[in-house]
Regions:
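C-terminal regulatory/interaction module of P-loop NTP-utilizing enzymes
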Residues: 1-280
Length: 280
C-alpha cells in the first residue's frame, strides 16, 4: 500500500514520496521542520489512510531509551514477595511493556511514532540503534528475544533542538517539511475552514506572512497558530473592515495573541502596522 495523501492532511508530492520511500527501504522516516508544520499529524494521517493502528511515544527531556522497550518493576515484586502474593512466581507480572515491545509483538502491522526525539539527551538515539535497525531486543529478566512479528512503519520527528548522531541518521530516510508557501497554505486552511470568505482569508494570510517576514522576530508563528487565529476570527465574527482597520487607536489587528507570543514581537508588529498605515 502507498500513501497518497488524505482528506484531512495536505501532503506535498515530495512528502508522499518520502513516506513511500521509507516504507520501501524498510527504514524509519525521520521528519524535521518548524514546530507546527504537521510532523506529528503526518504519522496519524498515514496510519489512518493505510488502516494501521498507531502507537505513539512522545519523548521528554527525561525519557530514556529503555522505557520504549520495557521496565522491570522490582519494587512491586519485592513488596508482593513480602506480602506472600502468588504473583511473584511469574516475573512477567512485573514487566511493563514499552511502545516498541507493543509494536514488535502486535498481531498486525502498525505505525509507530517516536515524537520529538531531539528532546531527549544526546545518547538516546544511539541507545535505540540496534533495536530499530534489527527490529529486536532481549529482555534479560524473562530471558526472551522480542522480535518484530511485522516490521512497523516508523515515524521519527525532530524540531532540530539538537543534532542527531550520524550513525542514527544513516539508518533513517530523511525528509524536511518546508514551511508552506501561500498556495499550499490556502489548501491547508480550506481543509479546516472550507466556507471562509475569500476576502477575509486573503487579508488574514497577508497579515500572517507579514508577521513571519518581520526582521528580528523572536518566534515566527506556525501553521497551527494561523489556524488558531482563523478559528478565533470566525468564532468572534470579525469582519474584513475590522481586520483591515486604519484606526490609529487600534495598534494591531484583533486576536493576534494567537500568532505572537511575546511582547517584543508584538512591538515589532505594531511598528510594521504603523508604517503600513503611514504609506497609504
Amino acid at each position: 500500500m502507498k500513501f497518497q495523501g488524505s482528506q484531512n492532511y495536505v501532503a506535498t508530492e515530495d512528502l508522499m514520496l518520502a513516506v513511500n520511500a521509507s516504507a520501501t527501504l524498510r527504514k524509519p522516516l525521520l521528519v524535521k521542520g518548524e514546530p507546527g508544520t504537521g510532523k506529528t499529524m503526518l504519522a496519524e494521517e498515514v496510519a489512518e489512510a493505510l488502516k494501521l493502528p498507531l502507537l505513539q511515544w512522545h519523548i521528554k527531556s527525561t525519557t530514556k531509551a529503555q522505557q520504549g522497550l520495557y521496565e522491570y518493576d522490582a519494587v512491586s515484586r519485592l513488596r508482593d514477595s513480602q506480602l506472600g502474593d502468588e504473583k511473584v512466581k511469574d516475573i512477567h507480572n512485573y514487566i511493563l511493556k514499552g511502545v516498541l515491545w507493543q509494536a514488535f509483538t502486535a498481531d498486525q502491522p502498525v505505525a509507530l511514532l517516536i515524537d520529538e526525539i531531539d528532546k531527549a539527551d544526546i545518547e538516546f538515539p544511539n541507545d535505540l540503534l540496534r533495536e530499530i535497525d534489527r527490529m529486536e531486543f532481549y529482555c534479560y529478566e524473562t530471558r526472551e528475544l522480542i522480535k518484530a512479528k511485522h516490521r512497523p512503519l516508523v515515524f521519527i520527528t525532530s524540531n532540530n533542538e539538537k543534532e542527531l548522531p550520524d550513525a542514527f541518521l544513516r539508518r533513517c530516510f530523511f525528509h524536511y517539511i518546508k514551511f508552506p508557501d501561500a498556495e499550499t497554505m490556502k489548501k491547508i486552511v480550506d481543509v479546516h475552514f472550507p466556507g471562509l470568505k475569500k476576502e477575509l482569508l486573503a487579508a488574514a494570510m497577508k497579515t500572517f506572512y507579514d508577521v513571519r517576514n518581520l526582521p528580528g522576530l523572536k518566534k515566527k508563528p506556525s501553521t497551527s497558530e494561523l489556524l488558531d487565529w482563523l478559528k478565533l476570527l470566525v468564532a468572534e465574527d470579525i469582519s474584513l473592515d475590522v481586520l483591515q482597520s486604519q484606526d490609529n487607536k487600534v495598534s494591531v489587528p484583533p486576536l493576534v495573541g494567537a500568532l505572537l507570543k511575546n511582547e517584543q514581537d508584538v512591538t515589532l508588529f505594531e511598528k510594521l502596522v504603523f508604517m503600513q498605515r503611514q504609506n497609504r
